[in-house]
UniProtKB/Swiss-Prot annotation:
Compartments, record wording: Cytoplasm, Perinuclear region; Endoplasmic reticulum; Golgi apparatus
Presence of the UniProt keyword Endoplasmic reticulum in the record: yes
Family designation: Belongs to the TRAPP small subunits family. Sedlin subfamily.
Record-linked InterPro entries: Longin-like_dom_sf (IPR011012), Sedlin (IPR006722)
Any Pfam family: Sedlin_N
Record protein name field: Probable trafficking protein particle complex subunit 2
Cellular component, GO annotation: cytoplasm; endoplasmic reticulum; nucleus; perinuclear region of cytoplasm; TRAPP complex; TRAPPII protein complex; TRAPPIII protein complex
The keyword Nucleus is annotated on this UniProt entry: no
Role, per record: May play a role in vesicular transport from endoplasmic reticulum to Golgi. Involved in dsRNA uptake.
GN (gene name): Trs20
Subunit structure: Part of the multisubunit TRAPP (transport protein particle) complex.
Domain of life: Eukaryota
GO biological process, one term: endoplasmic reticulum to Golgi vesicle-mediated transport
């Protein structure tokens, strides 16, 4: 069983997009589980900002840990932060997922009808995140 909570955080610490990937059956999942992962991701924002100055890499592996949850992050050149809260180690899968989602985010950002730093509501973006989540995180 593995669970991943993915969130894209804007420049003003506002959530732009969020998605949960899980192999756990929906009936077995607890409702407060979602609030916990959101809280962990929000609490890790300061650590992400701290770590981004210490490395030239865009990807930050396991920057924080809370009980059984790990936090991994990816920072774009425009200071948009991709954060994954996960309960098992999968560094290679997370790296590939971040790279694919970054590419998808760039394509979405180039859309003339999308304003940077606003919530992403594109059905294609949602579909691609679902595909990449199943491919890299849940396989």
């Amino acid at each position: 069983m593995s669970t991943y909570y993915f969130v894209i955080v804007g420049q003003n610490d506002n959530p732009i997009y969020e998605k949960e990937f899980s192999t756990v059956n929906k009936e077995l999942r607890k409702e407060d589980h979602r609030h916990l992962t959101q809280f962990i991701a929000h609490a890790a924002l300061d650590l992400v900002d701290e770590h981004k100055w210490k490395t030239a890499n865009m990807q930050l592996k396991s920057i924080d840990r809370f009980n059984q949850w790990f936090v991994s992050a990816f920072i774009t050149a425009s200071q948009i932060r991709f954060i994954i809260v996960h309960d098992n180690k999968n560094d290679e899968g997370i790296k590939n997922f971040f790279n694919e989602m970054y590419d998808t985010y760039i394509k979405n950002s180039m859309n003339a009808f999308y304003r940077i730093n606003t919530p992403i509501k594109s059905p294609m973006f949602e579909k691609k995140s679902e595909i990449f989540g199943r491919k890299y995180l849940l396989s």
